[in-house]
């Protein structure tokens, strides 16, 4: 068994918005807490994929950028100085004979008395553009993540994809880039009706139904793409400075079953106290499932304190499940 100094009361797997709020709440409860995340920075998909997008269903915020929400959550958590392990993926979860939970990762081994999964839809990878030699331009002119819209200022940009995210990026870049095109392989988009209506009224050039069939280049420099009709032979050369691929993301959750967790429909089944079938292990946010579950960030914010309180009650049966209100725990914004 690891030395006592290496054992945490609570380890949160996942540093997205719900994981960050769980960490804040664990700080209020004075739990020795660690966050482990596979990404290079906290925030999950909100940071990696949509930092410039507005979120409209966070209580108290008529609209807030995803990146700003994450910055606020990090600031809220900061006073507790939790340990954070980034670019570290959990590869195995096991319960030791004494009940201690062992987490093997790509960088080492961690020990914790309780664990909360807050991994959203799991560790994710973008669906890449399936064209030969595309890797030569990825990260330069071909992008799967957009973290700063300003770099597209005055440029000719195309977004490939037919869902809400692709439409959102096209509309947001409309007032930034010189020209914006959106490419979809079907005649109709899969986005919400209101978003599609906004797109049709915008100056964004709609290229449907087309697929990207080739990359155009000159002296090994990206100059655009060739489009081919989905059902036909007509081709179209589209000069571009940048191409954003929004074909969605793949994630694998098969390892959760291998670890013994009760999983169905790509989610961990939990009880009303957010506990799983493994003692001391809890799940919150989009990764957890129960009857009537609604997948919203706001829902996860409610689940996080429930999981933390019950995890600490599991750890210390004399601990209160219903703690005192936060207003009595802070003075001038600083924990007492």
Curated annotation (Swiss-Prot):
Catalysed transformations (reactions): 2 reduced [2Fe-2S]-[ferredoxin] + NADP(+) + H(+) = 2 oxidized [2Fe-2S]-[ferredoxin] + NADPH
Binding site for FAD: 37, 45, 50, 90, 124, 286, 327
Positions of disulphide bridges: none
E.C. numbers: 1.18.1.2
Enzyme class: oxidoreductase
Gene Ontology molecular function, alphabetical: ferredoxin-NADP+ reductase activity; flavin adenine dinucleotide binding; NADP binding
Cofactor, how bound (note): Binds 1 FAD per subunit.
Tagged with keyword Oxidoreductase: yes
Pfam families in UniProt: Pyr_redox_2 (PF07992)
Keywords: FAD, Flavoprotein, NADP, Oxidoreductase
Cofactor needs: FAD
Subunit structure of this chain's protein: Homodimer.
Similarity-based family: Belongs to the ferredoxin--NADP reductase type 2 family.
Protein name: Ferredoxin--NADP reductase
Species whose genome carries this gene: Enterococcus faecalis (strain ATCC 700802 / V583)
């Amino acid at each position: 068994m690891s030395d006592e100094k290496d054992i945490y009361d609570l380890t949160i797997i996942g540093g997205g918005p719900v994981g960050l709020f769980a960490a804040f709440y664990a700080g209020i409860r004075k739990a020795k807490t660690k966050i482990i995340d596979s990404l290079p920075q906290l925030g999950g998909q909100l940071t990696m994929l949509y930092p410039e997008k507005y979120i409209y269903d966070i209580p108290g915020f008529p609209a807030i950028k995803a990146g700003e929400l994450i910055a606020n959550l990090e600031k809220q958590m900061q006073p507790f100085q939790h340990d954070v392990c980034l670019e570290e993926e959990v590869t195995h979860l096991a319960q030791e004979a004494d009940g201690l939970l062992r987490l093997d990762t790509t960088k080492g081994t961690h020990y914790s008395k309780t664990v909360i999964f807050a991994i959203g839809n799991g560790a994710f990878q973008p669906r890449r553009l399936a064209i030969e030699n595309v890797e030569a331009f990825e990260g330069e002119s071909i992008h799967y993540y957009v973290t700063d819209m300003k770099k597209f200022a005055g440029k000719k940009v195309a977004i490939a994809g037919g869902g809400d995210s692709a439409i959102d990026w096209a509309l947001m870049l409309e007032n930034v880039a010189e020209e914006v095109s959106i490419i979809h392989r079907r005649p109709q988009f899969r986005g919400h009706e209101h978003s599609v209506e906004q797109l049709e009224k915008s100056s964004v050039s709609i290229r449907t139904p087309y697929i990207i069939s080739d990359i155009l280049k000159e002296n090994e420099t990206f100059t655009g793409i060739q489009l081919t009709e989905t059902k036909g032979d007509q081709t179209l050369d589209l000069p571009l400075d940048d191409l954003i691929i929004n074909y969605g993301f793949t994630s694998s959750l098969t390892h959760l079953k291998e670890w013994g967790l009760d999983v169905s429909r790509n989610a961990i089944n939990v009880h009303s106290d957010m506990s799983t079938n493994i003692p001391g292990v809890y799940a919150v946010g989009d990764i957890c499932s129960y009857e009537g579950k609604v997948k919203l960030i706001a829902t996860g914010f409610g689940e996080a304190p429930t999981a933390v309180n019950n995890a600490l009650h599991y750890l210390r049966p004399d601990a209160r499940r219903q703690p005192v209100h936060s207003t009595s725990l802070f003075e001038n914004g600083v924990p007492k």
